[in-house]
Each structure stands twice: as C-alpha cells, then as structure tokens.
UniProtKB/Swiss-Prot annotation:
Residues that bind D-glucosamine 6-phosphate: T28, K86, I87, I88, H89, E98, D99, I100, Y129, K130, D134, R158
GO molecular function terms listed in the Swiss-Prot or TrEMBL record: glucosamine 6-phosphate N-acetyltransferase activity
Subunit note: Homodimer.
Keywords, sorted A to Z: Acetylation, Acyltransferase, Transferase
Protein family (similarity comment): Belongs to the acetyltransferase family. GNA1 subfamily.
GO terms for biological process, alphabetical: UDP-N-acetylglucosamine biosynthetic process
Binding-site list for acetyl-CoA: I100, A101, V102, G108, Q109, G110, L111, G112, K113, Y143, E144, K145
Protein name: Glucosamine 6-phosphate N-acetyltransferase
This enzyme's EC code(s): 2.3.1.4
Species this protein is from: Saccharomyces cerevisiae (strain ATCC 204508 / S288c) (Baker's yeast)
One Pfam family per UniProt: Acetyltransf_1
Recorded catalytic activity of this chain's protein: D-glucosamine 6-phosphate + acetyl-CoA = N-acetyl-D-glucosamine 6-phosphate + CoA + H(+)
Other known facts: Present with 2550 molecules/cell in log phase SD medium.
Length: 159
C-alpha cells in the first residue's frame, strides 16, 4: 500500500515542532516545548545509534517519521520506532513503536496504517526480531489491521 497522491513521508525535522505537537494532541497532553528544546531533541535523535555487529549499516536508535500533505506542507501524521539492543535473543534488536498520531483533519484516509507499515519496515530492515507497541483498548482493532496481535499486558507505575 502506498501513500495517497499529495502526501510524502520523511524523517521529523527541527521545523516540525508546532505541527508535530499539534498532531500529538489527538493522542495525549503535550505540554510546552520550546524550539530550543525541540531542536536539541531532534539533534539527539539524529545522532543516537545502536551498537551494530555489521558496521556497514548504521542503526539509528530513534526513527521519528512524519507524513506530510504536499499541498500545504502540513504534518498529517507522526510516529516513531525506537530500536533497543537486548541481551536476550543473542543480543537481538527489538523495535518499540511510539506516539502514533494522525491530525484530526486527516483521519480516515489510511495514513495511520501507512505510517505503521513504514515504521515496521524500518524495524525489520534493521534486523529487529520483534516490534512491539502499547495502545489503548479502543485502538486494538486498528493495530490488528496493521498485523499486530495481543502479546501480553502493559503495566505501568506513574509518579
């Protein structure tokens, strides 16, 4: 499945702050983020790598992606896959999909599934043995359509 006409996908950039935070508000509270802090975050994400046996292939630890409307240069969707090097599975890689959000103006166009597909491709291309995510009960059917299956229970503790 490819992106609909008029959209493209790319890595998140420093100039995306306002649109990304606005898009993430459909998911949860975002709070106040200064342009300076966002710039530092993007720089960190662009430099952080995961140790790799195959030095020919750089494994980016953070892979924040956005789907953009070409007509307006508006961020329509955002998400991230974070790559973790584990001890188990012979020092295997595990991908964690995080912060999937589609701008309310663009929902219902299949962009969320396309974004998930792209993030899964990134994870498997890096060699992840599995890709996991946490979601609200109301989103289970969506993630099942994306090929995910229930594999346990999420637990949390908050301060």
């Amino acid at each position: 499945m490819s992106l609909p006409d008029g959209f493209y996908i790319r890595r998140m950039e420093e100039g995306d702050l306002e649109q990304v935070t606005e898009t993430l508000k459909v998911l949860t509270t975002v709070g106040t983020i200064t342009p300076e802090s966002f710039s530092k975050l993007i720089k960190y994400w662009n430099e952080a790598t995961v140790w790799n046996d195959n030095e020919d292939k750089k494994i980016m630890q953070y892979n924040p992606m956005v789907i953009v409307d070409k007509r307006t240069e508006t961020v329509a969707a955002t998400g991230n896959i974070i790559i973790e090097r584990k001890i188990i599975h012979e020092l295997g890689l595990c991908g964690h999909i995080e912060d999937i959000a589609v701008n309310s103006k663009y929902q219902g166009q299949g962009l969320g599934k396309l974004l998930i597909d792209q993030l899964v491709t990134i994870g498997f291309d890096y060699g992840c043995y599995k890709i996991i995510l946490d979601c609200d009960e109301k989103n289970v059917k969506f993630y099942e359509k994306c090929g995910f299956s229930n594999a346990g229970v999420e637990m949390q503790i908050r301060k």
